[in-house]
Amino acid sequence: GGESSNEAKGMWFGPRL
């Protein structure tokens, strides 16, 4: 969840906000 972060495979925020 955030920048350069894959949270739940892009379900919440994604690889980039």
Swiss-Prot record:
Keyword set, alphabetical order:
Amidation, Neuropeptide, Secreted
Leucine amide is found on L17
Where are the annotated coiled coils located?
none
The record's listing under InterPro entries reads: Pyrokinin_CS
**What is this protein's function?**
Myoactive.
In which family does this protein belong, per the annotation?
Answer: Belongs to the pyrokinin family.
Predominant place of localization: secreted
Give one GO molecular function term: neuropeptide hormone activity
Q: Which GO terms describe its cellular component?
A: extracellular region
Gene Ontology biological process terms in this record:
neuropeptide signaling pathway
| Subcellular compartments | Secreted
* Superkingdom classification of source: Eukaryota
Give the organism, scientific name: Blaptica dubia
Name used for this protein in its record: Pyrokinin-5b
